[in-house]
């Protein structure tokens, strides 16, 4: 492609609203432009990268036995109402009405649509397993779109769905997809880790996320420093290694005056105790009920673990007004001892072994000391309810936990019968009995993967595209189009390289050499070939973007040199 004929609007200045490096570079290098908040144009270079990513994905999907189709973006509300997600998905679901008043949504995902399709066509176990996928635009009304393509309101996604007659069949497809995803992210050049994850609004049980390691990532990965264990911090099990409390050590419960002392740090300082000796009591609203969650003062409550424990659709921290109404005191003085409110109390495992601890007295300006949960608190269940911390023992027993930031680029789920039961998607088994289909779903963020690649592959000059996804193989520069020797050599090489099967971006613009070099580094194609002052001798400069190495090569040896590089 001649650069004079395509559309690559490069910029020298960093956009003021671009926080992430990938956002800055994709805008500056002429890959994307914002249409409105969270919605972007994919310009020709970005479109080519996306096509390369999609090609890699399609090959891996075919190897995994998945067939491609294309489903509607506009989805009728009735299907979402059948699954129940119309009422629980939240404001991120873009809803609308047609001229007749019928309700629709712009699909953030396609579980309902694919389940509706398959239930109408697949009636027998003989048609299972079946795996279908699409590459489609998705929509999510993000409250705060940010980081360019990493968190947008419109994005490109590959989503696959599998249907099975047995858990064993689902396991087999899940493992194939896990392998396919690992292959995809390796081939596109990402440094990634598969991690144990929470299924969130998707439902289901077993799930893994594929995280591209990056400081701009919004997710925290907890991983072992000596084993392969890795999990999203929301799901990482915090192992309890403490001992049981000894009643012989219990002191008499005492209420003490603690004026205006509301936080854990304040109460620890006021009473001259370590925060680990304080009991943190946090009231949550779980759907329409309230639960009191207890952790040690130096730990943080994991709301995802709370949600999974109580089986609620929505878990939120209770507001000050709700705490006053339910408990009868300010949040800073809430505690589990002599609690009159009829709420279930759940406690983290570390609380069970606490001895002579401090807790709120459910009265303004007062706390209890010498609180012993085994004696003084009626706990419904002790379980893991805290966020794991760096330095904790790894859940697999090997090594200690370290943290890293990651960008979620893919996720695989075992949905089970979550959607097939609610939407009555059944098949007849060998005995002629109707059974709910067992489902899996598998997503890759195509546009997010594009940004993640740039986050990991760049330097101070611009993007450094991995060969597998680069928009072009080569960047051919005629440094001075007014020089006949340079122009003629560049034109000859352009035709020859194209005939040899290379995808070439030919900079034939009437620009200064410095501008062409700067744009070439910014765009980041793997190899640059410059026709300059030695063009009359048949000598060109070949420069490799990743290593920065440059070589003077004769045009007769150019093709073999590039192929061997």
Swiss-Prot record:
Keywords attached to this entry: Aminoacyl-tRNA synthetase, ATP-binding, Cytoplasm, Ligase, Nucleotide-binding, Protein biosynthesis
Major subcellular location class: cytoplasm
Domain of life, per lineage: Bacteria
One Pfam entry name: tRNA_edit
InterPro entries: aa-tRNA-synt_IIb, aa-tRNA-synth_II, aa-tRNA-synth_II/BPL/LPL, Anticodon-bd, Anticodon-bd_dom_sf, Pro-tRNA-ligase_IIa, Pro-tRNA-synth_IIa_bac-type, Pro-tRNA-Synthase_IIa_type1
EC numbers: 6.1.1.15
Catalytic activity: tRNA(Pro) + L-proline + ATP = L-prolyl-tRNA(Pro) + AMP + diphosphate
A single GO molecular function term of this UniProt record: ATP binding
Compartment annotation: Cytoplasm
GO cellular component term of the entry, any: cytosol
Keyword Nucleotide-binding part of the UniProt annotation: yes
Gene Ontology biological process terms in this record: prolyl-tRNA aminoacylation
Protein family according to the UniProt entry: Belongs to the class-II aminoacyl-tRNA synthetase family. ProS type 1 subfamily.
Biological role stated in the UniProt entry: Catalyzes the attachment of proline to tRNA(Pro) in a two-step reaction: proline is first activated by ATP to form Pro-AMP and then transferred to the acceptor end of tRNA(Pro). As ProRS can inadvertently accommodate and process non-cognate amino acids such as alanine and cysteine, to avoid such errors it has two additional distinct editing activities against alanine. One activity is designated as 'pretransfer' editing and involves the tRNA(Pro)-independent hydrolysis of activated Ala-AMP.
HAMAP family xref list: Pro_tRNA_synth_type1
Quaternary structure and interacting proteins, as annotated: Homodimer.
Domain notes: Consists of three domains: the N-terminal catalytic domain, the editing domain and the C-terminal anticodon-binding domain.
UniProt protein name: Proline--tRNA ligase
